[in-house]
């Protein structure tokens, strides 16, 4: 049976191979940060995003889209990783610059056979342009998922700064640049 989570609620993860599905109704950038026991992200190389979509144990989409799929292999996570934060951000391309102007994002965690383990609809967002949707965390050797829904009005830079990343504005700018649509060819 699928657990329908509310903000702050957690649920055990019976599988180590997971697919995280995002339905946002508007193109969003989807990514993940890998953090230590305190949730601190030690450096920009611990962020999976469109410009660097693969890290040990996690693969994220290469471009913003309304429907996203992230692959996670908890068994392949380095031993120093205790938290995986799934993040969503509006890039400002295509109109919407705040989550309050779009439909509430829906996130589902599914096992290797596609069966949903847990779902979460991220409600209550308004002026925020970045949000930690879910957190996968390791406690006493077992992995769980927690519905977060923690939004950031200051966008991706504030989100990354909150996770202890040094120079978060630089990292956010690089991530958003990697997610920007390619410039249209010049007309001749």
Mark where each language-model region is.
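Intrinsic-disorder/low-complexity signal
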Residues: 1-188
């Amino acid at each position: 049976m699928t657990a329908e989570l509310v903000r702050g609620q957690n649920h055990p993860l019976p599988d180590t191979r997971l697919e995280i599905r995002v339905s946002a109704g508007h193109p969003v950038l989807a990514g993940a940060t890998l953090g230590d026991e305190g949730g601190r992200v030690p450096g920009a190389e611990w962020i999976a995003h469109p410009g660097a979509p693969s890290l040990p144990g996690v693969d994220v989409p290469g471009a913003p889209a309304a429907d996203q799929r992230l692959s996670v292999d908890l068994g392949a996570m380095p031993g120093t990783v205790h938290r995986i934060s799934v993040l969503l951000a509006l890039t400002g391309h295509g109109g919407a610059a705040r989550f309050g102007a779009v439909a509430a994002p829906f996130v589902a965690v599914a096992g290797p056979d596609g069966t949903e383990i847990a779902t979460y609809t991220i409600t209550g967002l308004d002026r925020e342009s970045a949000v930690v949707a879910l957190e996968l965390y390791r406690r006493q050797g077992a992995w769980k998922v927690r519905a977060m829904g923690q939004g950031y009005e200051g966008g991706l830079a504030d989100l990354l700064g909150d996770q202890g990343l040094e120079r978060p504005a630089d990292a956010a700018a690089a991530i958003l640049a990697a997610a920007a649509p390619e410039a249209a060819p010049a007309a001749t």
